[in-house]
Each structure stands twice: as structure tokens, then as C-alpha cells.
């Protein structure tokens, strides 16, 4: 039977039958109703701990969270999956998706970049652990994109010092920028300041 109405969802949410919730969660997942699926997977996940279905539930729960853009929790759940099921056929994919969730949390270059640095570290861990992965090229591209963001941030800091006429600090920051990012496309501009 197809779950369609909001009423069906509310009934299954309040239902104590774990097997019915599991079936409904998978149905919502297959129909790409990620929020409903994630809510149900969250509810049933503790009840299936240690059982054969736990692997599938954990992966689907993390995937649902990714699809509703809850990157913080999705990253945690994918990492949890890799730790719990390191030999799973889905372990490599989960490791990549965890790193990808960190990438998605990286803010624009004008903001503080702790999340960007963390994302680079997680992607690099994936690259190091799965050097033959089909996702290697994607992960490397994401690392490069994040490094460019760090370059932009560092260059903008130097420009800001110059703008407020703190030339001594501008020179220090821009010299450091040039040595930290020798191949940067901003090199000429940094030397100009």
C-alpha cells in the first residue's frame, strides 16, 4: 500500500510497530520523501541496533539527512556508518559522502574558514584511505576548490589591512600569503600591494 497522505505519515509516526515504521521509512526513501524517511529512520534506528537491518537503516538515514541538507548530522551519521561497518560494500561511498558533507558546510570565503580547513582534512583522509576510488577525482577537485577559497580569504585579509592603511600588517600578511600560496593567481596583485 502506498503512503500518500499527511494523515498516513502522522499515523505511522505515532505507531509503536517498529516493522511497520521500517517499511514506511523505506517507502518514503524510495519515493525521495527525505524528511519523512529521516524522521522514521531516526525513530527506529536504536531499536535495530545490532540487528542485520541496522547497516541499511544507518546508511539510508544518513543519506536522507544529506538530501534534506542537514550536512552536520549527515556527516556524523556517515562517519558512524564507516566505523560500524568498515567492511560494508557501502563503506567507501559513506566515507566519501561524509567528507562531501563537510565540504557542503564550508562557508563563503568572506567568513571564518575553520569548516573549510576541516573539510579539506576530511577529503584528504578519504583520498589517502581510498586511493583507487572512483570518487578520487571528485574529492581532489573539491579539495582544490576549498584551497582556492582559503587563498581568497588570505588575500582579502591582506587587502583589508592595506585599505585601512595598516601598511606594515598588509606587507606581513601579503608576504606570508605569497609564501603560503606560491602558485596563486593573486600573486601579481599581492606583490602590487
PLM features per residue range, with description:
Residues 1-193:
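Acidic, polar-rich low-complexity tracts and alpha-helical solenoid repeat scaffolds
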Amino acid at each position: 500500500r502506498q503512503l500518500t497522505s499527511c494523515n498516513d505519515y502522522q499515523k505511522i509516526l505515532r505507531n509503536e510497530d517498529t516493522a511497520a515504521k521500517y517499511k514506511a521509512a523505506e517507502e518514503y526513501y524510495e519515493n525521495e520523501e527525505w524528511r519523512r524517511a529521516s524522521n522514521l529512520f531516526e525513530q527506529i534506528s536504536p531499536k535495530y541496533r545490532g540487528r542485520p537491518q541496522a547497516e541499511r537503516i544507518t546508511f539510508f538515514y544518513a543519506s536522507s539527512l544529506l538530501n534534506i541538507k542537514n550536512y552536520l548530522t549527515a556527516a556524523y551519521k556517515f562517519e558512524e556508518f564507516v566505523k560500524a561497518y568498515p567492511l560494508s560494500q557501502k563503506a567507501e561511498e559513506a566515507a566519501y559522502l561524509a567528507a562531501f558533507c563537510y565540504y557542503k558546510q564550508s562557508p563563503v570565503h568572506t567568513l571564518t574558514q575553520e569548516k573549510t580547513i576541516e573539510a579539506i582534512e576530511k577529503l584528504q583522509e578519504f583520498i589517502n584511505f581510498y586511493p583507487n576510488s572512483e570518487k578520487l577525482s571528485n574529492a581532489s577537485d573539491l579539495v582544490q576548490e576549498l584551497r582556492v577559497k582559503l587563498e581568497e580569504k588570505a588575500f582579502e585579509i591582506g587587502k583589508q589591512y592595506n585599505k585601512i592603511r595598516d601598511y606594515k600588517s598588509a606587507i606581513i600578511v601579503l608576504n606570508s600569503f605569497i609564501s603560503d600560496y606560491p602558485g596563486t593567481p593573486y600573486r601579481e596583485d599581492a606583490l602590487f600591494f
